[in-house]
């Protein structure tokens, strides 16, 4: 039985004051003990969030990490070993905004994936198609290719200690979302793709859905057999909304 996970990606949002307010709100939430719950603030606020949530069950992660595990001469970057030292537990890799807006390619993302695991952290590998690719019927081809990049480099067993987040690019920050059935179809295809390599890994790895999940649609999305939780964007900036999503995952 895969343990559900809900991870909140705060993206490039927050001030010390607004983060403190959000921490306070999260501390008041009744959260299910059956769900792994994480938030990923902007790195500037990592220590504030870790300290503020210490009395809760919420773990803290990061939105990105450098291509090398150890600290060194890489201006502007944060090493995964530094994130681990700060108390982070997981790190996003390959988020669509990094792929689309920053132009990160698979070779760079593979280095980050390896560095994150080398530091004892859990990579949350983000995969997904653009609207153009979806219209062209290339969804499964695209997500398969993104998965295969990691599998070819490290073997499918590397995904045992990872989480996969399917995030259709066209549904991020747009208010659009795949129907539960559409999301399930892709999640099932991802699991089948992994099963060709290793059935045990395919059944064990958690697949999160990351396309405009809200409290209003979370219950139905999370009821799908191959959706093990959500990677939450804008809704994670509202403590009550995020709490409701976490409770939906616990049901």
UniProtKB/Swiss-Prot annotation:
Keyword Ion transport: no
Enzyme Commission number, as recorded: 5.3.1.1
Compartmental location: Cytoplasm
GO molecular function: triose-phosphate isomerase activity
GO biological process, one term: gluconeogenesis
A GO cellular-component term linked to this record: cytosol
Main location: cytoplasm
Subunit note: Homodimer.
Physiological role: Involved in the gluconeogenesis. Catalyzes stereospecifically the conversion of dihydroxyacetone phosphate (DHAP) to D-glyceraldehyde-3-phosphate (G3P).
Protein name (database record): Triosephosphate isomerase
Gene source species: Pseudomonas savastanoi pv. phaseolicola (strain 1448A / Race 6) (Pseudomonas syringae pv. phaseolicola (strain 1448A / Race 6))
Gene symbol of the encoding locus: tpiA
């Amino acid at each position: 039985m895969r343990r559900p996970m809900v991870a909140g990606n705060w993206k490039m949002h927050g001030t010390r004051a607004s983060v403190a307010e959000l921490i306070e709100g999260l501390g008041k939430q009744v959260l299910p003990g059956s769900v792994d719950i994480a938030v990923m603030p902007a790195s500037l606020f990592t220590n504030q969030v870790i300290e503020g949530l210490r009395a809760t069950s919420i773990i803290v992660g990061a939105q990105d990490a450098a291509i090398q595990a150890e600290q060194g001469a890489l201006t502007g970057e944060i090493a995964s070993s530094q994130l681990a030292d700060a108390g982070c537990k997981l790190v996003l890799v390959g988020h669509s905004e990094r792929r689309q807006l920053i132009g990160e390619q698979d070779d760079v993302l593979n280095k980050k994936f390896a560095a994150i695991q080398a530091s004892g952290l859990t990579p949350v590998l983000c995969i997904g198609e653009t609207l153009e690719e979806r219209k062209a019927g290339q969804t499964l081809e695209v997500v398969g290719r993104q998965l295969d990049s990691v599998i070819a480099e490290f073997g499918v067993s590397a995904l045992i200690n990872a989480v996969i987040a399917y995030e259709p690019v066209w549904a991020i920050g747009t208010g659009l979302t795949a129907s539960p059935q559409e999301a399930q179809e892709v999640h099932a295809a991802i699991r089948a793709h992994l099963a060709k390599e290793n059935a045990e890994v395919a059944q064990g790895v958690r697949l999160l859905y990351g396309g405009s999940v809200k409290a209003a649609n979370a219950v139905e999305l999370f009821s799908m057999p191959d959706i093990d939780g959500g990677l939450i964007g804008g809704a994670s900036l509202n403590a009550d909304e995020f709490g409701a999503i976490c409770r939906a995952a616990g049901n």
